[in-house]
A protein has these predicted regions:
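A donor-sugar binding/catalytic signature common to diverse glycosyltransferases
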Residues: 148-174
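Short loop/helix-cap segments at secondary-structure boundaries that form the rim of catalytic
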Residues: 26-29, 41-50, 126-134, 151, ...
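Active-site-proximal region of nucleotide-activated glycan assembly enzymes
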Residues: 6-70, 78
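Alpha-helical segments flanking ligand/cofactor-binding loops in enzyme cores
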Residues: 3, 25-26, 106, 168
């Protein structure tokens, strides 16, 4: 689409979310009038005169949320008096995170902390089947979290895949 738009004289821009430019964006950069980047030093991949440092897009709900920690923890059915660890692998999930939790269920169950595990849609059925009849009370399992502002607010610690969007959100929320 960008190639066609450029041929038609329509101004185009691309957005590179990562600190290392992908092959596609490096190729598309030739057609783009501007290249929005999240990090300094992107001149090694793109012409400096085309670069605009915009940062990565983040969910507006993270900025506008007013939920308090106790309310956020309770929204997951957990105890506000206990520490909470949020484990997220993105919307598709992260097999290594899910497998680690499943391999250490005894540690999870005997822990003084509580856990929210976002499995991702792909792994959810497998995880819930594995947990049938043996899910620890301090472990909440969900395929997807629609209110990430509440999830982040509830968490004392986040264990996550290192995606560009996730890292940008962590920088925003602290």
């Amino acid at each position: 689409m960008l190639n066609q738009a450029a041929k038609m004289g329509i101004p185009c821009l691309i957005q590179e979310q990562n600190s290392y430019a992908g092959v596609t964006n490096k190729l598309l950069a030739k057609k783009a009038e501007r290249i929005c980047v999240a990090y300094d030093g992107m001149e090694k991949f793109f012409p400096a005169e085309k670069i605009i440092k915009t940062g990565n897009p983040v969910r507006q709900s993270l900025l506008s949320s007013t939920i308090e920690k106790d309310e956020a923890v309770k929204s997951f059915g957990l105890d506000p008096e206990k520490k909470t660890i949020l484990l997220v692998g993105g919307s598709l999930g992260a097999r290594t995170i899910n497998d680690s939790v499943m391999q250490h269920l005894d540690l999870v169950e005997n822990s003084d902390v509580q856990f929210v595990l976002q499995t991702g849609k792909y792994y959810h059925a497998q995880i819930t089947d594995t947990l049938k009849g043996r899910q620890p009370k301090n472990l909440v399992v969900t395929d997807f979290i629609s209110d990430m502002a509440a999830a982040y607010k509830a968490a004392d610690l986040v264990i996550s895949r290192a995606g560009a969007s996730s890292i940008s959100e962590f920088c925003l929320i602290g």
